Amino acid sequence: MKEKTTATTTTTTIPTRNADDDYELIKVLMLGDYKTGKGSVLRRYHYNEFELGVSSIGVDFVIRDYGIVNGKYYKIQIWDANSCERFRSITQAYYRGAHGFMLLYDCTNQESFNNLQFWINEIINKSPNSNNSTIVIIGNKCDLVNDIKIDPIKSKLFCDSKSITSFQNVSAKDSININEPFEILFKQIIEKGHSQTISPKLIKQRYENNNNKSCNIL
């Protein structure tokens, strides 16, 4: 059974830009145990909607405009890597080029909290820039107040022990605290100067050059 809910959104005005203008791309990877609600959190943040009973399969991502910071235009690419056991072996490629990570656990599931260390180890072992990675941790499903197993104080102490500066309990279902951890993560990444410059003009030129070479061979 599927239930769909929506909440009020706040619209941010994005400056008019040409499609060929350069921009800075920030790549964020969402990690956590299966059924912690990564897809639901991403859906709530990006589309402002919630659909009960929908699980992400494999890897999915969204790209959204962020805006201008210090004269540079930023776009955010957020990857939802499904971490069911059968997918863990294929996620290494998605760590490459990641500027930040959002780790999720289920507030009602102690094991998902215990496994946060596994996901931190994955970042250390698979991300080339792990020594300077930006990480936030969120506990999803805080709306299930009678079923919560992890005390927020315990979560905060864990974050402090790992030098992770941001922790937040959220609810994708009830749209509680969804935007704040994303904004904190993006701002910390930008402050560190971590992003990839994308030049659509250069990409287009390379594509055309490659096509011309192929035509000359024929």
Curated annotation (Swiss-Prot):
| Motif placement: Effector region | 54-61
Give residue ranges for the propeptide.
Answer: 216-218
Q: List the disulfide bonds.
A: none
Q: State whether keyword Ligase applies.
A: no
Q: Name one GO molecular function term.
A: GTPase activity
Enumerate the subcellular locations listed in this protein's record, separating them with semicolons.
Cell membrane
What's the name of the protein? Ras-related protein RabT2
Instruction: Write the lineage as a comma-separated list.
Output: Eukaryota, Amoebozoa, Evosea, Eumycetozoa, Dictyostelia
From the UniProt record, report the name of the gene that encodes this protein: rabT2
